[in-house]
Amino acid sequence: MNNVIDGKALANEILSELKHEVQRLKDKTGESPKLAIVLVGDNPASIIYVKNKIKHANKIGIDTLLLNLPITIKTEDLIAKISELNLDQNVSGIIVQLPLPDSIDKNKILSAISPSKDVDGFHPLNVGYLHSGIDNGFVPCTSLGCLEVIKKHEPNLSGKNAIIVGRSNIVGKPLSALLLKENCSVTICHSKSQNLSSITSKADIVVAAIGSPLKLTSGYFKPDAIVIDVGINRIGGNKIVGDVDFENVKSKVKYITPVPGGIGPMTIAFLLKNTVQAFKIYS
């Protein structure tokens, strides 16, 4: 049995469905969804991520607008740019590529995006909806991608023991809310958690999102675990690895996502799904 989950194939299924939906919407309204991407500075990794998002958006018929702003821009000037996008009726969704320079107040920037265009799901209102169990806002894309992968391979999550290693607002916290909604018993661990392997080795589902290359070795998992690796770490120059020691773990668990080719493609697919949803709500 091939237990390595092909995130790219799953993402392509979603993108194919979205492409047909975008065409139907265009036939009906004469317009296409439009995603505005705000990129501050010239962080090489951010540039790669943004190009990838634009490529996949355009491939399925979503228009894109890239605002590439200087690293010297002030918080208030960036907020003014976002306000213009909020008012632009042709823009369906807005994302600000993270990380931002230290000189910019990230919380103010994310709060400046209109919640109805916040397709990354980072606005405090959308965060509040998610953690209140209200289906009325956008949910962070990586956490949606993780849940989709998990449910494809374990449709009934009720009563399952899920451990999330990582407490970020992008993955750990939103995914905990999604898994709780599926009636999982959820534990969040992090870099300061003690005896981590003794906790994760009891879990049915382990999500690694701690940003520590190859940290979780085979002793961290029980044999029938589903392992979702969200980590993206660069080692030895150009090699990309996850937070899980993939080569030594893959034969010892039920399912595992690779890095790259696992959760990354799913994140982009759900970003574009959120963008289409924003367009449908507005139109």
From Swiss-Prot:
Task: Relate the protein's function as given in its record.
Answer: Catalyzes the oxidation of 5,10-methylenetetrahydrofolate to 5,10-methenyltetrahydrofolate and then the hydrolysis of 5,10-methenyltetrahydrofolate to 10-formyltetrahydrofolate.
Q: In which pathway does it act?
A: One-carbon metabolism; tetrahydrofolate interconversion
What is this protein's record name?
Answer: Bifunctional protein FolD
Which catalysed reactions does the entry list for this protein? (6R)-5,10-methylene-5,6,7,8-tetrahydrofolate + NADP(+) = (6R)-5,10-methenyltetrahydrofolate + NADPH; (6R)-5,10-methenyltetrahydrofolate + H2O = (6R)-10-formyltetrahydrofolate + H(+)
Q: Name one GO biological process term.
A: methionine biosynthetic process
| Organism lineage string | Bacteria, Pseudomonadati, Pseudomonadota, Alphaproteobacteria, Rickettsiales
Matching entries from Pfam families are given as: THF_DHG_CYH, THF_DHG_CYH_C
- How does the record describe its quaternary structure? Homodimer.
Keywords from the named record: Amino-acid biosynthesis, Histidine biosynthesis, Hydrolase, Methionine biosynthesis, Multifunctional enzyme, NADP, One-carbon metabolism, Oxidoreductase, Purine biosynthesis
* Gene Ontology terms, MF aspect: methenyltetrahydrofolate cyclohydrolase activity; methylenetetrahydrofolate dehydrogenase (NADP+) activity
NCBIfam families documented for this protein: PRK14171.1 (NF010768)
GO terms for cellular component: cytosol
The family annotation for this protein states:
Belongs to the tetrahydrofolate dehydrogenase/cyclohydrolase family.
Instruction: Identify the domain of life.
Output: Bacteria
Q: What is its EC number?
A: 1.5.1.5, 3.5.4.9
- Detail which positions bind NADP(+): 166-168, 191, 232
